[in-house]
């Protein structure tokens, strides 16, 4: 307990000291790892499942109130983009606090290798490419026609982002209220920054209709860099609707869903403007479940790009596949994602048997 108090005290001491000696910037970036990284099922539904009550590791990143019951599965997802230059990892599981309470945990990683640093590498010699002639473009600090970079002065560096998200929810006046605490460690070359943020979500199911609400970065999420600079991300509001249709004769479920987001600074070129100044975005998803074993999914992001996926479920093993072709959410190329969820009890049994074999 004393150690925990010391950590909290030091964290807030850094914040207070930094405010006195650094710049504070309100930015629209810094927490994208919690938006881009998820599991295959969530991304196949275009991240529109804010009001869809499913036991899925990535759902709590959309709405912490969807930590509805303890899920005895651990979910793993790997994604590689841009010919292996960018890689991301996703791990999600639930951890009991006591016999009747639990925390849903997600661990994230995203790394980009081999980023070129061209500072100081420009041969700023103008249009003719010859030093000292003082022709057009020479010495202006910009890469102009006829100029080039000195390859020997270009070096490569890496960027790494580690994220940790914990969600817990409780029933309050027929609504399930959830709190999501997120922590981030961001390194760029030799620089690093740490930050924390809070999301608050709500969910209610009424006659097979799910309603979800979440405020992200409340009151704001902060990232403190080693240099002392502080980057603050303002809050945004997201809401979702889901409707369940059951056809018991065919053992079939149909689940359409919708998401709307009212943004602040984190808008994109595809955002719609309400009243000419309020950026909003929409996405939609659809999932069909046959005999609770076979899943078919399709989703549409704000920019109109389609996502699709399938899934197979057994008692203690789930596999999901998703195909994405969305430059805004997941890079500039087509992406294939594969997620695997395995029962923790099955893993314990497997490793116990291996240990016994070694003995």
Residue ranges with predicted function:
Residues 3-4, 35:
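A general structural signal for short secondary-structure junctions and capping/turn motifs
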Residues 4-14:
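Sec-dependent signal peptide recognition
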């Amino acid at each position: 307990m004393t150690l925990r108090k010391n950590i909290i005290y030091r964290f807030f001491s850094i914040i207070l000291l930094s405010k006195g000696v650094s710049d504070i910037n309100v930015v629209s970036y810094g927490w994208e790892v919690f938006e881009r990284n998820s599991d295959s099922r969530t991304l196949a539904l275009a991240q529109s499942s804010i009001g869809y009550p499913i036991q899925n590791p990535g759902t709590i990143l959309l709405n912490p109130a969807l930590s509805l019951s303890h899920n005895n599965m651990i979910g793993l997802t790997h994604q590689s983009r841009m010919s292996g230059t960018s890689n991301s990892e996703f791990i999600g599981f639930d951890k009991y606090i006591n016999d009747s309470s639990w925390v849903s945990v997600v661990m994230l990683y995203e790394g980009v290798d081999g980023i070129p640093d061209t500072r100081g590498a420009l041969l700023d010699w103008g249009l003719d490419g010859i030093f000292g002639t003082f022709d057009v473009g020479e010495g202006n600090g910009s890469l102009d026609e006829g100029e080039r970079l000195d390859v020997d002065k270009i070096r490569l560096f890496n960027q790494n982002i580690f994220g940790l998200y914990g969600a817990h929810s409780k029933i309050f006046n027929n609504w399930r209220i959830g709190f999501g605490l997120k922590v981030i460690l961001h390194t760029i070359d030799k620089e690093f920054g740490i930050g924390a943020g809070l999301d608050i979500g709500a969910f209610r199911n009424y006659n097979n209709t799910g309603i979800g609400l979440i405020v992200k970065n409340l009151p704001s999420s902060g990232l403190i860099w080693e240099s002392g600079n502080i980057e603050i991300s303002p809050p945004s509001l997201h809401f979702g609707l889901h409707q369940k249709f059951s056809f018991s004769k065919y053992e079939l479920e149909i689940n359409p869903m919708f998401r709307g987001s009212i943004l602040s600074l984190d808008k994109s070129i595809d955002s719609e403007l309400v009243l000419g100044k309020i950026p909003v975005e929409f996405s939609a998803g659809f999932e069909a479940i046959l005999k609770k074993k076979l899943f078919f999914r399709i989703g549409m992001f704000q920019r109109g790009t389609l996502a699709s996926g399938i899934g197979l479920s057994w008692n203690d093993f789930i596999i999901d596949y998703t195909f994405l072709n969305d430059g805004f959410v997941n890079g500039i190329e087509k992406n294939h994602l594969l997620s695997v969820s395995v029962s923790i009890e099955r893993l314990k049994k497997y490793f116990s048997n291996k240990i016994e074999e070694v003995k």
